[in-house]
Regions:
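Gly/Ala-rich beta-loop-alpha elbow adjacent to hydrolase catalytic centers
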Residues: 98, 102, 106
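Conserved serine/cysteine hydrolase catalytic core
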Residues: 192-236
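Alpha/beta-hydrolase fold catalytic core
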Residues: 1-29, 49-52, 91-92, 119, ...
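Conserved alpha/beta-hydrolase catalytic His-Asp/Glu region
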Residues: 132-138, 152-209
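Conserved HGGG/HGGXW glycine-rich cap/lid loop of the alpha/beta-hydrolase fold
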Residues: 12-68
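Catalytic active-site module of serine/aspartate enzymes centered on a nucleophile-bearing elbow/loop
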Residues: 241-283
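Flexible "cap/lid" loop of the alpha/beta hydrolase fold
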Residues: 107-153
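Conserved acidic catalytic loop of the alpha/beta-hydrolase fold
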Residues: 77-94
Length: 283
């Protein structure tokens, strides 16, 4: 696996990993809040690698990317991060695959740069708005109850909340070794970063109907963090989106049922490639 350091928005250094076939169709994976590129290990080290170029970035403030104190409220910075990875690695019309908070970053990119450089969009257990009653209506009370711990500077309180978060992600609980790997990269994200992520307030209701590239929305039917009703929010703005409900999965279907997830993602990427020249893109 290759690693890269890319200068993102405002010069923040981003950690990026790459696996798979350099000549294959490209997927850029964008993880959720407090996670890291390691969340995608069951994609990066899978049968997808045979035919696809697989790239995963650590968001600013996460993983091995730089963690500035105050650089999380500006949509343009997030957009610049994604654009920088596309440019630095010369990604050829990637499918952008975002989990949980990741779709917000994808939409930041689309707002500022349009969709002419991408082939398609994949939302996984994702949200598209923050800081409003409509945004909060699709977030579970169990997750909301953990927010004080996410923001706590007391180590024990923070770790307890993050472990509870991880357990909420899964219907079938991960092994102890997997759980504590995940906990490690969650704990590496400072509380001020989580504060910055969730202090943003915006919706993308104006942007979603303008998207013309193919969209796949994957949602675990047993998601205990983002309620499955979020799909109705997405469909209101993305009438052309494909909807994939995974009946036995929770918030992380790419981990819990990676084989089925990867198969569906592969088919979507192939469809995006076939459609790449067939539809006009938003500017």
């Amino acid at each position: 696996m290759k690693t890269h350091k890319v200068a993102g928005g405002g010069g923040v250094r981003l950690h990026v990993v790459e696996a798979g076939n350099p000549a294959g169709r490209t997927i850029l994976f964008i993880h959720g809040g407090s996670q890291s590129c390691l969340a995608w290990s069951r994609q990066l080290d899978s049968e997808l690698a045979r035919d696809h170029r697989l790239v995963a970035m650590d968001l600013r403030g996460h993983g091995l990317s730089e963690k500035p104190r105050d650089a999380y409220g500006d949509s343009r910075l997030w957009a610049d991060d994604v654009r920088a990875v596309i440019d630095a690695l010369n990604l050829d019309r990637p499918v952008l695959c975002g989990w949980s908070y990741g779709p917000l970053v994808i939409l930041d990119y689309l707002r500022h740069y349009g969709e002419d450089r991408i082939a398609g969009i994949h939302f996984v257990g994702g949200i598209t708005k923050l800081g409003s009653d409509a945004a909060m209506s699709v977030i579970s009370p169990e997750w909301l109850s953990l927010v004080p711990g996410f923001l706590a500077t007391d180590v024990e309180e923070s770790v307890r909340s993050l472990e509870s978060l991880l357990r909420l992600c899964f219907v079938q609980q991960p092994s102890a070794s997997d759980l504590y790997l995940m906990l490690g990269y969650n704990v590496s994200v400072p509380p001020y970063v989580r504060q910055g992520l969730f202090s943003r307030a915006f919706d993308n209701d104006d942007l979603l109907p303008r998207i013309r590239k193919p969209v796949l929305i994957t949602q675990g039917a047993k998601d205990a963090i983002v309620k499955p009703e979020v799909v109705d929010q997405h469909k209101a703005g993305l009438a052309h989106a494909q909807i994939d409900i995974m009946p036995d999965a929770g918030h992380a279907p790419f981990w819990e049922d990676s084989s089925a997830f990867n198969q569906r993602l592969r088919a979507f990427v192939e469809m995006c490639s076939a459609a790449a020249m067939g539809r006009p893109a938003i500017a």
